[in-house]
Amino acid sequence: KISNKLEPWINGLGAGVVIAVLSFLTFELPLGAWLIFSFGSSALVVFVFYTSDFAQPKNIFLGHLLSICVGILINNILPVSPLSLGLAVGLAVALMAFFKITHPPAAANPLIAIFANVSNDFILFPIVAGSLTLIILSFLINKYLFKRNYPKKWF
């Protein structure tokens, strides 16, 4: 069991390792992007709130996937405006809640999709590849290094 005084530092270490690996894959290997800003918040969730439903693999993967798709869709049919940005985030939040795949960091993905004007390729890299890597690393670090019962359930 990790002591209460050490736990914040352990959580930070876990989150930092995940982001460092995703950064390495993005910047040091010719594989494409594996990292987006919202993964920083995801790393916080899987280490600080690892027992929460929001931190479970299904929510991470499907929340990010659904939210980026919503952002790309809205970006393709509406011009960038306060209305389109609000609609994209609101729709992503509603759909995550409806399908019980809420992952709060993923609510930023529609904004990323619209402001960066991403293509459909963004779905595979970084969303699918990065989410799966984040999930696998979080599992390995939480389960085997920190001896935590993570995840509660896979799907």
What label would you give each PLM region?
Residues 1-65, 69, 73, 77-86, ...:
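Alpha-helical transmembrane segments and their membrane-interface boundaries
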